[in-house]
């Protein structure tokens, strides 16, 4: 197995708190990791550092053995890193497919995208209708949209930041 991601001495400080203090983490290709801790322990901050949504104050990140500076979520996606945030970023007045298309290259054909959404959702056992408007979806269905959006990029690393925090116990079981 190869090292997919390595963090060395990642530190992120905010005016009133140190969110990450010299964190080291190694993720091998094919591994699954869970980061556990109390509220405010810096878990989400660390995930956002990996995804390029937050810049660390110090430390190094290596991707497939190469040192990288992930300065934005776009740069993370280009490397093959996707993230599902604990809070949705969907537009209620758009359809599932239209929401997902917003993060894709210009010129993406909606009909082809709808088929990819359907295929990906089925592959992972996530019921999803690409033509439904987001305002008609349950919270669980909105979370599925976010997960399928991340999976469509065929990521080498998928970050799930508390993906079940907004779901009912019944939806979590499903």
Question: Positions of the model-derived regions?
Answer:
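Glycine-rich phosphate-binding loops of nucleotide-dependent enzymes
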Residues: 1-174
